Amino acid sequence: MQFTLSAVVLALAGFSAALPAESMNNGLQHQNGTPRFPVPDSLTIEQAQAKCGDQAQLSCCNKATYAGDTTDINSGILGGTLSNLIGAGSGASGLGLFDQCSKLGAQIPIVIGIPIQDILNQQCKQNIACCANSPSTASGNLVGAALPCVALGSIL
């Protein structure tokens, strides 16, 4: 009798862990691919750099991860128990860090007036961020602290 009860409990636990989680898309990008924190269409690179300040560099980032902003809804008695133990839960990729960033700089206008390359949304279609002037990686330094980037749309 005890063997049967324990076999049933293990089978239910395995079944609930095997069910796929319903993932809520509350991360940086929405399902249609637009950034979570958009910037106004008329914002120029100079205005955006002024918002970032002199201690940060205006950057265009391909990847962003926000831990705690995603929610996995698991159904079942022990749903999600094993996934949280192996590190596959909400925010498993990191905490509010941007990755694969390239610096955006002001270009010299070729035509009189505001050139098309001066509009920020024409330069970067991904995530626009203000990144600290130090590298945002923790590898190879004594302190081991990574200084992340902040989404420009969140501080406007």
From Swiss-Prot:
The answer to whether UniProt assigns keyword NAD to this entry is: no
Q: Under which name does UniProt file this protein?
A: Class I hydrophobin B
Keywords of this entry: Cell wall, Disulfide bond, Secreted, Signal
Where in the chain are disulfide-linked cysteines found?
Answer: 52-130, 60-124, 61-101, 131-149
Question: What is the induction comment?
Answer: Highly expressed during conidiophore development.
- Please give the Gene Ontology molecular function terms for this protein: structural constituent of cell wall
* Residues making up the signal peptide according to the UniProt record: 1-18
Q: Does the keyword Disulfide bond apply?
A: yes
Q: Which InterPro entries match?
A: Hydrophobin
Localization (cell): Secreted; Secreted, Cell wall
One GO term of the cellular component aspect? fungal-type cell wall
Mutant phenotype after disruption: Leads to the loss of hydrophobicity. Disruption of all 7 hydrophobins leads to altered germination kinetics, decreased survival under exposure to extreme cold stress and increased mycotoxins patulin and citrinin production.
Give the similarity note.
Belongs to the fungal hydrophobin family.
Function summary: Aerial growth, conidiation, and dispersal of filamentous fungi in the environment rely upon a capability of their secreting small amphipathic proteins called hydrophobins (HPBs) with low sequence identity. Class I can self-assemble into an outermost layer of rodlet bundles on aerial cell surfaces, conferring cellular hydrophobicity that supports fungal growth, development and dispersal; whereas Class II form highly ordered films at water-air interfaces through intermolecular interactions but contribute nothing to the rodlet structure.
